[in-house]
């Protein structure tokens, strides 16, 4: 993963963890947890593309891999909707900027995962 994406993930996760939103903190913690999970998945998928041995292993487990990939895209869509909702209800400009950046990062990561998955298919 490129260093800008790594620092973007870390920056957004740090800022989200410091937020105190009117909605329950459990909602935000869920978003943070999903965001971290997505980051790890994206990292592992990128590493898999780099190692041909894993490529052949993934081909052998193709059905399971495709199901997992589908679940990750569902998680991304859920995160995008949650962040859009949070963006609509927040009035704090710091939070708005954080959510806008999180949304941009999610869209970038979704595109990267799509690119990696096409390379693996």
Swiss-Prot record:
Gene: NS
Record's subcellular location: Virion; Host nucleus
Family: Belongs to the influenza viruses NEP family.
InterPro entries: Flu_NS2
Cysteine pairings via disulfide bonds: none
Superkingdom in the source lineage: Viruses
Keywords, ordered alphabetically: Host nucleus, Host-virus interaction, Transport, Virion
Residue span of motif Nuclear export signal: 12-21, 85-94
Protein name: Nuclear export protein
Keyword ATP-binding found: no
Pfam families with a match to the protein in the record: Flu_NS2
Subunit structure: Interacts with protein M1. May interact with host nucleoporin RAB/HRB and exportin XPO1/CRM1.
Entry function: Mediates the nuclear export of encapsidated genomic RNAs (ribonucleoproteins, RNPs). Acts as an adapter between viral RNPs complexes and the nuclear export machinery of the cell. Possesses no intrinsic RNA-binding activity, but includes a C-terminal M1-binding domain. This domain is believed to allow recognition of RNPs bound to the protein M1.
Gene3D superfamilies documented for this protein: 1.10.287.230
Listed GO biological process terms: exit of virus from host cell nucleus through nuclear pore
Any one annotated GO CC term: virion component
């Amino acid at each position: 993963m490129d260093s800008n994406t790594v620092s973007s993930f870390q920056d957004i996760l740090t800022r989200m963890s410091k937020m105190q939103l009117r909605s329950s903190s459990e909602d935000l913690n869920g978003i943070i947890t999903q965001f971290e999970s997505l980051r790890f998945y994206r990292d592992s998928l990128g590493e898999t593309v780099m190692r041909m041995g894993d490529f052949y292993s993934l081909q052998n487990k193709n059905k399971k891999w495709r199901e997992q990939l589908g679940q990750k895209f569902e998680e991304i869509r859920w995160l995008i909707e949650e962040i859009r909702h949070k963006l609509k209800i927040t009035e704090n400009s710091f939070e708005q900027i954080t959510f806008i950046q999180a949304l941009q990062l999610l869209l970038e990561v979704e595109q990267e995962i799509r690119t990696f998955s096409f390379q693996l298919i």
